[in-house]
C-alpha cells in the first residue's frame, strides 16, 4: 500500500523553502506506486489530519479541514481506480521491460504496468514514451491518452505491434510552454479485445 504525500502538507515539513505538496505531487505518488506493484494507495490531506480550521495548526496553514474535503487530488483519486478497474486486474504486473526509455526518478519517471493484452504507462512529466515491439499480445494495438486530472481519454490511433512505437504526450492545455509539462497515462490495448475506456460501461 502506497502512502507518500499528503495534499497541502509542508514538503519535508519545510514549507518556507520547499512549499506545500500539491495535487500533482499526490497524483504522481499514487500512479507511480500502483503501477510499480502496490496493491493500493492511501490518499491523505494535511488540513483533515487534525480537523483544524485554517491557521489552527501546522497542517492547516492554508485551508481548513472542510475545504480540504474537496481538494483537487481528493477528487482525482477516483480516476486512478477507474483506470485500474477498466481492465483485468489479476494478471497485471509492473513491467519496465516493455519500455525503450524509463526516465530517471521523480518527475522524469516513466512507469509501466501491463496485463497480457493491455498496458498502462505513466509519464510523470509528459515525456515521450517509447514502447518495444510485441509488448503485449495482438497484431494491432489501439492507443489512447488518459488524463489523470479528468479521467477522459483521447484516441491516438491503431498501430502495428511488430515495431517500436513512440508516443508524444499532449502539451498542457492551460499553459502550452515546453518547460511546463503535465503527467499523462498511455493506454495500449490489443485491438481485438475491444476494451471500453475507463468509466464507460462494458
How would you label these PLM feature ranges?
Residues 1-17:
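Glycoside hydrolase catalytic-domain groove-lining segments
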Residues 13-15, 24-157, 171-202:
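Aromatic- and carboxylate-lined catalytic core of secreted/periplasmic carbohydrate-active enzymes
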Residues 168:
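Residue-level detector of conserved, well-ordered beta-strand and adjacent loop positions
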Amino acid at each position: 500500500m502506497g502512502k507518500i504525500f499528503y495534499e497541502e502538507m509542508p514538503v519535508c515539513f519545510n514549507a518556507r523553502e520547499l512549499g506545500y505538496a500539491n495535487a500533482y505531487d499526490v497524483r504522481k505518488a499514487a500512479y507511480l506506486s500502483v503501477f510499480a506493484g502496490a496493491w493500493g494507495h492511501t490518499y491523505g490531506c494535511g488540513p483533515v489530519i487534525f480537523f483544524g480550521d485554517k491557521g489552527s495548526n501546522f497542517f492547516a496553514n492554508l485551508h481548513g479541514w472542510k475545504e480540504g474535503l474537496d481538494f483537487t487530488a481528493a477528487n482525482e483519486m477516483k480516476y486512478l481506480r477507474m483506470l485500474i478497474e477498466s481492465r483485468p486486474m489479476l494478471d497485471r504486473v509492473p513491467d519496465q521491460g516493455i519500455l525503450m526509455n524509463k526516465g530517471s526518478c521523480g518527475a522524469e519517471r516513466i512507469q509501466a504496468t501491463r496485463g497480457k493484452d493491455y498496458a498502462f504507462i505513466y509519464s510523470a512529466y509528459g515525456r515521450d514514451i517509447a514502447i518495444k515491439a510485441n509488448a503485449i499480445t495482438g497484431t494491432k494495438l489501439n492507443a489512447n491518452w488518459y488524463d489523470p486530472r479528468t479521467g477522459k481519454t483521447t484516441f491516438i490511433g491503431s498501430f502495428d505491434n511488430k515495431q517500436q512505437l513512440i508516443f508524444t504526450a499532449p502539451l498542457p492545455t492551460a499553459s502550452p510552454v515546453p518547460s511546463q509539462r503535465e503527467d499523462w497515462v498511455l493506454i495500449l490495448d490489443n485491438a481485438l479485445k475491444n476494451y471500453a475506456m475507463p468509466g464507460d460501461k462494458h
